[in-house]
Amino acid sequence: MLAEPKLVALFLLVAVECLSLSASTIEVTEPAGAAHGYPGLCDINGKKLADGEFRQWIENKRLHVVITYKFSDGDVYEEQAQFQQQPALTQEKWSWKESKNGASQREFAADFLSGMASAHIRKDNKDVSKKIDVEPGRTFAGFGFSIALSNLRKRLLGGEQVQLKAVGFSPFPSLTPQVVTVTTSYGGLDRMRMSGRLLKGDRFIIHPELSIIAKLFVNVPDTKIWLTNPAPAGFLRWEGPIMLPDDPIIRVDLLSGAKSGPAEPEVR
């Protein structure tokens, strides 16, 4: 007689664990495919600094993203990322490289499969690598958050706040790879001038959840990402530090132009 209740309890426990697992990952509601674009990188005041090229494609059942920014003085920034979209959105690789006239200046990378992250800054002669705690399907870096938000859009528009993990690098006390909890939320509908056009976008906020002690030593600004409105939700604008928390805050626009305007609340 005792076996049946125990069996039922075991079944319920397994069911709850399965539900918890599925709830912690991001269901792909907006599958990404082949795309090619030419974004612009600006300072926070909208002055254009670099021409960009965005490439995205599917290969070996993986989504690949390469974004390159070329500056007039010979600087080149390049971001690369790889994702799995089934059974849930999962980032597998990410890297960011800054070079000048072909020579590497700064490099940051994270292998989500092995759990290793690394950083290199040439001028400071710093090279670090560290094992990081990756939660598959919940840990992202760089453009990965734009893809994650496009699939979380309906939930966030409905008022839900979703916590994810972000791979970052702290300059204090040393150049250390870290995984930080971030809260994603909806900030409102904005309009912004871009490449001579007035466009609308939904603003989403990525807020780092730092401990009180950490806040005493480092200030990590929120990152803002705008997705196109109305749906389907595609990338429109990104604002945040280049890489480290104390880096200059920059803006990346979907459409490249000589001048980029600030985002302002849409008057309904």
Task: Identify the meaning behind each predicted range.
Residues 1-9:
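Bacterial N-terminal signal peptides that target proteins for export
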Residues 8, 108, 124, 132, ...:
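Small/flexible residues
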Residues 9, 28, 142-145:
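Short N-terminal alpha-helical targeting/association segments
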Residues 9-20:
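Bacterial N-terminal signal peptides
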Residues 24-114, 163-268:
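Acidic, serine/threonine-rich low-complexity disordered tracts
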Residues 115-119:
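Mixed-charge (acidic/basic) macromolecular-recognition segments
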Residues 122-164:
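Surface-exposed beta-loop interaction hotspot
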